[in-house]
Amino acid sequence: MENLTLKTLNEADLQGKIVLVRVDHNVVKKGKIEDPYRIDSTFATICRIYAKGGRPVLMTHVGRPKDKKTGEITMEEKTSVMPVVKYLEKKLSLRIKVPEFKAEDAFGYKTLCKEVMDPLLGELKSGK
């Protein structure tokens, strides 16, 4: 049986590739970034991916925002990842796109709409 090894970021050929990066940017409280350390600590990874010709796709969240009365998941400006997006855009001089989520009451969670994701993925693949 062949031994498979996972390449490090420095070893990987990222030219023209889309790289999914799970980041812990869960630092927004009441619509503001309390401490940017977690965001800042990902700059080297994001920049390395770009330097190697890759296109990073960041995946994060901001807590589990629930309405205190109903217990339902809510999507409000104060629990949005937009403060993180604006911070990254400013610090790294990037343009970042964030897909919109749609509430699915029957399931009690948010899902990505195909109508939203298909154009974003198309742009990502074409390098826009």
Model-derived features with residue positions:
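Active-site loop-to-helix "anion-binding N-cap" substructures in soluble metabolic enzymes
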Residues: 1-128
